[in-house]
Amino acid sequence: MVLNLLFPMVVAVVAAFGAARMQRRLRPDWATWTLTVLSGGAALAVLWALMALATGFAAEQPGLARVFGWCDVVFSSHDRVPAPVGIGAWAALLASAVSVAIRLHRRREVMRMTHEQVAGSSEPVAFAVPGRPGRVVVSKGMLETLDSAERRVVYAHEHSHLRRHHHRFLHVADAAAAAVPLLEPLSRRVRFATERWADEDAVVEVGDRRLVARAVARAALASSASGVHPTPLGINGSGARARVEALMLPPGGVTAATLAWGSLGMVGLAVSVAGTTVQFHHLVAFVFHICGLH
């Protein structure tokens, strides 16, 4: 049982990272969708496996059987989960739940920043705040840093974040990384992909790739010089240097090899998620069957 659950869990994480290596060869919108699905799917596979191990271990404990009315035949009717593995699974699930709660709380705190709190600040800050309605917050310091054409880029970039609902992708990726810390690199890739997507939308809006590259570079340099950390859904966000380099090049296409490797990773991830789901379902069905539960 343990190996049957650990194997698809490992395959899911490896497949996710393998497919994620294709990020730079995909259009930013495709990369955002692909990476988000990969991170969410890999986290789901890992959590399903941990839940199955934790449930299997709990079902073997006589004390819990008396409390919940489980039948004793469970203890001798299937492969037992070793105590270190079972306890580790429960600890990992608890840590995941706490980590996700903390991550979501911190993100909500950032999103509560109001226009009044930031607009008059001398620090160069610009970011989008999702909601109904969503809003774009640009500080006085950022406006003074950029010329009029570059300001237009900033607003186009931030409105793209709102229009494309990029916060939803970030929520999934952040929750996945909080639940499974191994997936933190994928979360960073999703943040970078959403910024690249907004950059390309800004290019469509202003019609000048070099202008967008210059605006991104100046915003990032000003923020760095002021000690301002990159903000989610902000033009000074993830990977400014790599974004500028991408903007200085013409838009790239997608090769057959890229699609093939990406598809292979997605298939491997899907199989792993399905495998862990089936294993968990079989465990629950097994307990219900031999205990005569309905």
Regions flagged by a language model, labelled:
Residues 37, 175, 215-219:
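Short acidic/histidine-centered micro-motifs embedded in hydrophobic/aromatic stretches
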Residues 192-207:
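An active-site-proximal "capping" alpha-helix that borders the catalytic cofactor pocket
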Residues 84-159, 164-167, 171:
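Peri-catalytic and regulatory segments of divalent metal-dependent proteins
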Residues 1-120:
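N-terminal membrane-targeting/anchoring modules of bacterial envelope and secretion proteins
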Residues 34, 157, 198, 244:
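Divalent metal-coordination and catalytic microenvironments
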Residues 169-172, 208-217:
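Acidic/histidine metal-binding catalytic segments
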Residues 165-187, 191:
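Post-HEXXH active-site segment of zinc metalloproteases
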Residues 4-12, 16-17, 75, 79-110, ...:
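Cytosolic-facing loops and C-terminal tails of multi-pass membrane proteins
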